[in-house]
């Protein structure tokens, strides 16, 4: 190669520009949405962090309540999407492949008018798909989403 330097790995290569986060590897800092990740991990809920990533700011109390309700309403899977996940589990497909297939099937029955709506649907339905896949693999029926639970609690309880 004349005039070009071959680099191993991606060192020094810009893969993408983003406003969502910043990494200072030498200082050991990760900033997400303008906040050090340690601050978010200790002071923000999962829903607050997702809201921050979608809206570029933390939510008010009223916005957070509405966002939690919105996510809860988007958690369900259609019978067709369940069928895809059930078949993937029965056929022994790897979990990531089953998640990909489940997300594709879930997107067919969702009203995703824009990228933000699509992102909320993905965030909401991933725990439902993952838990359904593992329960189907064990020969069990999936647990229906509980809209009263926060998103993180919902995700943890689905596998029980």
Report residues per predicted region.
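Hydrophobic alpha-helical bundle cores within soluble ligand-binding/oligomerization subdomains
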Residues: 1-160
